[in-house]
């Protein structure tokens, strides 16, 4: 219902610097005016939009002062929801905030449902559906590049691309249906429409091609550190984390289980997994660790194969490399600081061992080469494609990907039917379905149950 006024806590519950209670709806200003006494100046109902007022929240029944607050007023349509919005900035105590919220609810507001503020922004035309989902992507972003992609969506770059494709598609549909309804006046459909349909399909394919990178931005890159025992895998993990997370020892087999930590590497969120050294062992506990390492490697998006530059390439290193050749790899020569002699030979051996795989020499102990490693990770993930300023927005949402895949299926079917000379009404059925799937992304054809599912993922105050 858009004819009532909603309220909710817009900041995390508990103690903090401030707590913000947000109201939206036609009665938002009037409701707060009944419980807000400004320190000076006129009543809140005459306050100009986008201004702050200092005062006290007073219970009109008991006359008790509940908190000293700052109240901001944003009048429709120039607000997040395109409705009148009031935000009450309370002191950050849980009790004071709760009492103010309860008073607001007793005075005429209704407690908002999860995501209802953003849903109102969508229903009032302030945001389309892809932009509304971008709000949640911004909140959940775990990397700088993920945040950049989410902001790109919020600015409407994805929506514009989808809208352009949909507009061209509906134009072809209009021509096709006019040809069916008025064959004598309109004549046959221009063959150029088929060529444009192929271009629309290519545009959908370009968007789908960004999904893998988009998935890594939202889910994080699974990175396994592997190698024979005692090559410095745990030291590398500690160096990347800049903390002593894993036990480091000269005794082979010290790491007997996988250790997982999250960090930023090359602008991406990486779920870094330090694995037990890969070798044949009679030790039961170490064998369990090796088995878990193999499972982690199988699930990894990227594998860092670590070798010891000090001791040089060993047969065991070659066996490790052979066991992971089906993965995306970076070869890391560690302990560069301990190579006192023949450094050029050691690096040449590393190059020969790595072959066509990217390689980098590092000193986990001294922190040398880690920036180069981050760049290698970035190059592999982006594949030479720069995220910022790209013409093609990234697909980071699994719902968008599914809609595009369904759209593609119907476009391909329509093109095939057109090429085979099948009846125009059959072609139109596929084209309408393709257009509906594009509309689902930006919300022009979204069903109520889909909206319920999307906005239920939001917190109550958003």
Curated annotation (Swiss-Prot):
Cofactor comment text: Binds 1 potassium ion per subunit.
Source organism superkingdom: Bacteria
Residues annotated as binding GTP: 230-235, 249-255, 274-277
Known EC number: 3.6.-.-
GO cellular component, one term: cytosol
UniProt binding sites for (6S)-5-formyl-5,6,7,8-tetrahydrofolate: 22, 87, 126, 462
Cofactor(s) the protein needs: K(+)
TrmE-type G domain span: 220-382
GO molecular function: GTP binding; GTPase activity; metal ion binding
UniProt similarity note: Belongs to the TRAFAC class TrmE-Era-EngA-EngB-Septin-like GTPase superfamily. TrmE GTPase family.
Complex formation: Homodimer. Heterotetramer of two MnmE and two MnmG subunits.
Full protein name: tRNA modification GTPase MnmE
The organism of origin for this protein: Moorella thermoacetica (strain ATCC 39073 / JCM 9320)
Origin organism lineage: Bacteria, Bacillati, Bacillota, Clostridia, Moorellales
